[in-house]
Design a protein with these regions (language model features):
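C-terminal beta-strand-rich structural cap/linker in extracellular carbohydrate-active enzymes
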Residues: 483-486, 517-534
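Solvent-exposed beta-strand/loop surfaces of large extracellular or lumenal domains
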Residues: 493-519, 537-542
């Protein structure tokens, strides 16, 4: 079979803005306004209006905007509203870890039966959704928890539940996500208590002897999250001793700089912690630190990530020999990977990270939930034809009911899922060092920010991306203002074009960079971006020569009829689950999902012109603005394939391991429908190829 596309990851680090790829002058506009294509914006200055890295930290190409700057719309707002009305918004009524009775986060002595990572895991997303949607109930609840944590800080600066490990060392892991909650709260409220709170805590951390600092498994792996908060505070206060603490954290965190190994292979740790060297690179300026993060990403995917969807197989840990697309990843892992991608996009300016963030967000993350976001599952795989409460080990690493959609189970993911979409929204637009704006993750909505010489503008974005290739922007400004607008061109996109007020602007836009429009903008100016989407077949040579099918940023899965069977959420849960005694179980059922149609098909693919093997069918946009379901999918593909009788559910109750392609089968040719992977709760996304 002819090779269709190489899949081994091979990329280089982009350190500086690339040369101008195209240059033109806008017709009818004076002062030589320009349109250029660059690999990334220059970072020789600092944004005048939004908090950027202070020296000696590396200058940033992109700067995160305040929470209040971005208002999501369209499908993205719909996901947040579903979360608000679903498990995220009501987990405080369900989870025993969020009870306000005997909770160590609420007690001055910081002791209680309940109190560890669960509260901050949930609150960092719950609170941010409250800020973005301006939901009064959620805002009030968020403030309750934030006030309690601040008020219970100890005189020496320590805070949070007192948890000691067997060797008597204080476990600091749970404080790390709580610091992120504090940062978001400060961005929203400007409550000065937060800066004092964090400064006192970091002075306390700095005084801990190294042999007692970040020694336990979780905190040792995840020290980079602590470092993010240290730099956040440094950029607001400029206190130099904070840089000493960052160095201390780096020295005591697990070694994520190994050339051909990782300190551990836990899926969430890898997705969350591989960025630690790149975080410290901002201070060290050592190119090896930045390279280590890229190498970690490449390593895990070359071994366990030769699958579609942007993630890798580690259920819960990656294991030698378990690299088939039936291997799954935690919902936590998806959230942390997207978060890492967003951080790395800011600090490196490399569009590679935006591409991977979209891959996870569009093709993997939505499928971890029921369509109403009232239940989720712990593990999701690219090839997954049963989602039930049975024990599927050792086919997956974990023992227990890890595949069912259950609002009462999946303790860590049950809480940590909350931040996925809202962090995505917060990073959809970013400020630039030259006082411009960059649109990074296309979705409907609006951004309000200061640009140019301090003029506050609002840009409204209209699009059905990633289900449509056109993105329209309208600029609202009180007076004319000159600033650069950066439009990201994804790596999959060839032939991107842009127009201003209906006039096409010539620019040689290449995949993986930015169109930079510098103009003297006036109120009502319109910019239209087109990102032509094409069919592409990707071959996974290292995974049995299987293939996946992309259309633009979307990967497609076989449309499998899904039979949802409602079950009691309390009858089959993971061993560490817990719920409040008065949680209304009738409102929060669990679901097993079984295939109600055949799934064991291989695709017929034209090896010379693989894209000709599929037909794109475009459908109406869903009235409820939720495209991530099979029924609502705005795009489908029509393909042809054959059934493979020997490819069945195996002895562990899982989708069987892929057969090696090409597969010979005497079955008849069958018309197949493929749907976007992110809306398919049961899915075959890595297909065998049949002859």
């Amino acid at each position: 079979m002819k090779k269709l596309l190489l899949t081994t990851i091979n990329f280089k680090i982009r350190k500086y803005a690339g040369p101008l790829m195209a240059l033109c002058f806008l017709p009818g506009v004076s002062n030589a306004q320009t349109v250029v294509f660059i690999s990334k914006p220059a970072s020789t200055t600092s944004n005048a209006y939004y908090v950027s890295n202070k020296a000696p930290l590396t200058a940033q190409s992109f700067v995160k905007l305040p929470l209040s700057a971005i208002k999501p719309g369209g499908w993205l707002k719909k996901q947040l509203e579903l979360q608000k009305d679903g498990l995220t918004g009501h987990l405080g009524e369900i989870s025993i870890w969020l009870t306000k009775t005997d909770n160590a986060w609420l007690n001055k002595d910081r002791k209680g039966k309940y109190g560890w990572e669960e509260l901050p895991y949930w609150l960092k997303g719950y609170g941010d959704i409250a800020y973005v949607l301006q939901d009064e109930r959620m805002l009030k609840d968020t403030k309750f928890w934030i006030d309690a944590v601040i008020n219970n800080q100890q005189p020496d600066g320590d805070f949070g539940p007192i948890i000691y490990k067997g060797d008597g060392k204080r476990d600091l892991w749970a404080n790390m996500p709580m610091l992120w909650c504090m940062q978001s709260y400060y961005e929203y409220s400007k409550d000065a208590r937060v800066l004092s709170f964090m400064s006192k805590y970091f002075k306390w951390e700095l005084a801990i002897p190294d042999d007692k600092f970040l020694q336990d498994y979780w905190e040792n792996s995840r020290g980079g999250d602590n470092m993010v908060s240290v730099y956040w505070l440094y950029n607001r206060t400029g206190e130099k001793w904070l840089l000493d603490l960052a160095t201390k954290i780096d020295h005591n965190t697990a070694n994520w700089r190994q050339k051909n190994n990782l300190p551990n292979w836990h899926n969430v740790n890898v997705a969350e912690c591989f960025r630690e060297p790149a975080t410290y690179y901002q201070q060290s300026h050592n190119a090896n630190d930045l390279a280590a993060t890229y190498n970690d990403f490449k390593l895990i995917r070359n071994i366990y990530g030769q699958v579609p969807g942007g993630m890798f197989g580690a259920d819960e840990n990656a294991r030698k020999g378990y690299d088939d697309p039936r291997q799954a990843v935690e919902t936590c892992g998806m959230v942390e990977q997207m978060t890492s991608d967003e951080f790395l996009l800011q600090s490196t300016g490399d569009t590679f990270w935006a591409d991977n963030c979209e891959d996870v967000a569009f093709n993997t993350f939505p499928a971890a939930f029921t369509s109403d976001y009232k239940a989720l599952r712990y593990l999701t795989a690219p090839n997954m034809v049963v989602s039930d409460n049975k024990d599927h080990s050792p086919g997956i690493a974990n023992t227990g009911p890890f595949l069912t959609m259950n609002p009462f189970s999946s303790r860590c993911c049950q809480h940590n899922h909350s931040a996925g979409w809202v962090y995505y929204a917060e990073n959809s637009w970013m400020a630039t060092a030259d006082n411009g704006l960059a649109v990074q993750l296309y979705s409907e909505g609006e951004v309000t920010a200061k640009v140019g010489k301090g003029i506050r503008v609002k840009l409204t974005e209209q699009t059905h991306y990633p289900f449509n290739d056109r993105v329209n922007f309208t600029i609202n400004t009180p007076r004319n203002v000159t600033f650069p607008l950066y439009l990201r061109i994804p790596a999959w996109c060839n032939g991107a074009s842009v127009s201003i007020n209906g006039k096409t602007v010539p620019v040689n836009a290449m995949p993986g960079g930015y169109i930079m429009l510098t103009n003297n903008w006036k109120n009502g100016d319109e910019v239209a971006l087109q990102l032509p989407m094409a069919l592409k077949v990707r071959e996974w040579n290292q995974n049995k020569n299987s293939v996946s099918v992309n259309y633009g940023p979307l990967t497609f899965s076989l449309k499998i009829a899904e039979n949802y069977v409602k079950t009691d959420a309390t009858t089959a849960v993971q061993g560490d689950s817990g719920w409040q005694a008065d949680a209304d179980q009738s409102k929060w059922p669990a679901y097993n999902i079984y295939p109600a149609s055949s799934w064991n098909y291989g695709l017929l693919v034209d090896t010379q012109h693989p894209e000709l093997s599929f037909k794109v069918i475009k459908k109406q946009w869903p009235k409820d603005d939720n495209p991530f379901t099979n029924a609502n999918a705005p795009i489908e593909l029509v393909a042809q394939g054959k059934q493979i009788p020997g490819w069945t559910i195996d002895q562990y109750g899982l989708c069987g391991v892929l057969p090696v392609s090409p597969v010979k089968t005497a079955e008849k040719v069958t018309k197949l429908t493929l749907v976007p992977m992110g809306g398919a709760r049961l899915r075959i996304s890595a297909f065998p190829v049949v002859e």
